[in-house]
């Protein structure tokens, strides 16, 4: 049993491969490069191909399947970069990673606090030795209503951690759960939109919820609403977000993800023209905090993501059920 790791980061992920290889009895090979037509052959002799979010085409899957690859363990919670229908046709099985929810949850709360207290502007002005107070007054989160869309592991952790701040909490999910009810009131989306000062997204990306935050949704929100997204970039229509920021309907945004980020994030683009017009525009707003999909990035989470690949392949190869497998 052998896994080919593509886009394996030598400065963090690689250190965890050897111990988990021994623990699960699975060999591995790796490259720091993302999959391309020129390096697909690296997967010859492997039973699994593991990737981070990057460009994966149906043709890549066909080539790997012809080499005998059966498993596609993603080293990320999201798996929307994998052509799922093609994988199903080829009989290839997909899994995603798991890691403790606190890292992303606390990062989302950090973005809320930074936006409320205008930390981005304060730091930029401090870099220019502007230590005046004018324009830096923040808002107190304890007097605000926060809406959490998606109450899975991360969304519930956001609610639990926010409950100590004293703010009012509302939640929306297609499948409400009792743990979240300890901290928040479940409401419909329209009620959440019109009631909340801060809205934070914690739901998976699906075809059904693509651009769920569009012009119509934004029009229903409170004036000056703060939007936080540490989930998936496709949840927000970037054009509607830009229009909302320009009009002042959206008071601020904290974004760790954006649409069409694959191939852009996790690479050094210093000196390059940014190949994402919406992101280039969003970065120009002083009331937007942008980070390049790093909410997950802790030592605990990186170890968990690498282990998830080994653990899922071991279970699927042995015919065991695993919650990490994606049901196609």
Region spans (language model):
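Phosphate/diphosphate ligand-binding glycine-rich loop within oxidoreductases
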Residues: 46-123, 135-138
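N-terminal glycine-/charge-rich "phosphate-binding" loop or analogous flexible N-terminal tail
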Residues: 1-46
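Rossmann-fold NAD(P) dinucleotide-binding segment
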Residues: 56-69, 208-227
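Short glycine-/small-residue-rich Rossmann-like dinucleotide-binding loops
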Residues: 53-54, 197, 203-205, 231-232, ...
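Short acidic/histidine-rich motifs immediately flanking catalytic phosphotransfer sites
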Residues: 42-48, 67-70, 194-199, 222-225
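Rossmann-like dinucleotide-binding domain for NAD(H)/NADP(H)
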Residues: 224, 233-328
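A short helix->loop->beta-strand "cap" motif at the edges of active sites that frequently abuts
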Residues: 66-71, 90-92, 167, 223-225, ...
């Amino acid at each position: 049993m052998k896994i080919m790791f593509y886009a394996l980061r030598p400065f963090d992920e690689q250190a965890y491969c050897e111990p988990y290889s021994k623990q699960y009895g699975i060999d591995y090979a790796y490259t720091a490069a993302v999959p391309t037509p020129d390096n697909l052959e690296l997967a010859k002799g492997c039973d699994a191909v593991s990737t981070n979010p990057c460009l994966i085409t149906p043709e890549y899957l066909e080539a790997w399947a012809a080499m005998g690859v059966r498993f596609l363990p993603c080293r990320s919670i999201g798996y929307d970069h994998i052509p799922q229908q093609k994988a199903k046709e080829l009989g290839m099985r997909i899994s995603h990673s798991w890691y403790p929810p606190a890292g992303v949850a606390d990062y989302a709360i950090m973005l809320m606090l930074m936006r409320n207290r205008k930390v981005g502007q304060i730091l930029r002005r401090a870099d220019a030795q502007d230590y005046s107070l004018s324009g830096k007054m923040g808002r107190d989160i304890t007097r605000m209503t926060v809406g959490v869309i998606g109450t899975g592991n991360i969304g519930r952790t956001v609610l639990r951690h926010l409950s100590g701040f004293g703010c009012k909490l509302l939640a929306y999910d297609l499948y409400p759960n009792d743990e979240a009810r300890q901290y928040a009131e479940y409401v419909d989306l329209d009620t959440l939109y019109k009631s909340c000062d801060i809205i934070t997204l914690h739901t998976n990306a699906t075809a059904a919820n693509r651009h769920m935050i569009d012009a119509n949704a934004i029009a229903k929100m409170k004036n000056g609403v703060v939007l936080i997204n540490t989930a998936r970039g496709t949840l927000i229509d970037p054009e509607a977000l830009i229009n909302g920021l320009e009009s002042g309907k959206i008071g601020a945004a904290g974004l760790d993800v954006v649409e069409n980020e694959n191939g852009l994030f996790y690479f050094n683009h210093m000196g390059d023209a940014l190949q994402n017009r919406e992101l280039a525009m969003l970065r120009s707003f002083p009331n937007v905090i942008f980070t390049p999909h790093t909410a997950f990035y802790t030592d605990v989470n990186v170890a968990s993501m690498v282990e998830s690949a080994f653990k899922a392949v071991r279970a699927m190869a042995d015919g065991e059920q695993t919650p990490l497998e994606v049901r196609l």
